[in-house]
């Protein structure tokens, strides 16, 4: 079913993400590296000179405060983040940034999301055999003829089980609950805020729930067994959404009339 969905719905192209902004992290390279490595859940040492990486920050209890994509542009790191989370990101990290003489600067660059052929992965932060997801950053207006809409861009993320939190969902989930342990967290890099709890839940916790992508017919009505997280996408006669589901309910739910697949 997954391959069929890819073939029917995935569309290559670019989408201007009007509600995302770019925050430059300023300071000496060594200090910026130390600061980011001690705060972000991902390992910035794994980013190449022009690379992108899914990341996030947590509070001391291991709850995700906000998520974003970090980009390395030579010696400069850029945080690409929803505009409603940018101030939260800066406010949360400002007390720690002062110890490293690090500053944050919101710039005027434009963010463009890309759904690309899998052979074109140099701009990507996620890839499989069918397609890649990436970003482009422009100083001025961009002009391309391969534009896609928001749903077409978000579709690739839903199928990849990549979630972007909004303001109402901050500090509600730990990484293991929303697939961030697989996509936005490094368990080899060392300490960051909330790291001990995140690692404990990963290695010692019992997985009673699963973060899933649910594909249903348009008329399907969600009940209390399916906790929808994020935006629901509507494509023709189907719906695609992210959800947290009890493992004990999965077999029952996938057999319901109107459920096409649970990934």
Feature map (PLM): residue ranges:
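Basic, glycine/lysine-rich polyanion-binding surfaces/domains
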Residues: 1-263
């Amino acid at each position: 079913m997954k391959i069929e969905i890819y073939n029917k719905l995935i569309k290559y192209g670019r989408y201007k993400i009007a509600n995302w902004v770019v925050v430059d992290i300023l300071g000496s390279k060594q200090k910026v590296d130390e600061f980011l490595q001690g705060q972000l859940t991902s390992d910035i040492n794994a980013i190449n000179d022009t690379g992108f990486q899914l990341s996030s920050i947590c509070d001391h209890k291991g709850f995700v405060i906000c998520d974003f994509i970090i980009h390395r542009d030579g010696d400069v790191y850029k945080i690409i983040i929803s505009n409603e989370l940018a101030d939260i990101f800066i406010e949360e990290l400002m007390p720690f940034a002062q110890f490293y003489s690090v500053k944050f600067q919101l710039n005027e660059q434009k963010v463009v999301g890309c759904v690309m052929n899998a052979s074109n992965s140099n701009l990507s932060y996620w890839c499989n055999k069918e397609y890649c997801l990436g970003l482009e950053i422009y100083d001025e207006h961009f002009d391309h003829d391969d534009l896609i809409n928001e749903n077409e861009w978000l579709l690739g993320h839903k199928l990849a089980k990549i979630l972007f939190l909004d303001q109402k969902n901050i500090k509600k989930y730990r990484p293991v609950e929303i697939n961030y342990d697989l996509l936005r967290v490094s368990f080899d890099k060392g300490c960051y805020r909330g790291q001990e709890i995140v690692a404990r839940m990963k290695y010692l916790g019992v997985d009673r729930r699963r973060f899933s992508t649910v594909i249903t017919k348009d008329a399907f009505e969600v009940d209390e067994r399916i906790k929808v997280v994020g935006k629901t996408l509507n494509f023709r006669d189907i719906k695609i959404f992210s959800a947290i589901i009890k493992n004990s309910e999965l077999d029952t739910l996938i057999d319901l009339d109107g459920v096409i697949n649970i990934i």
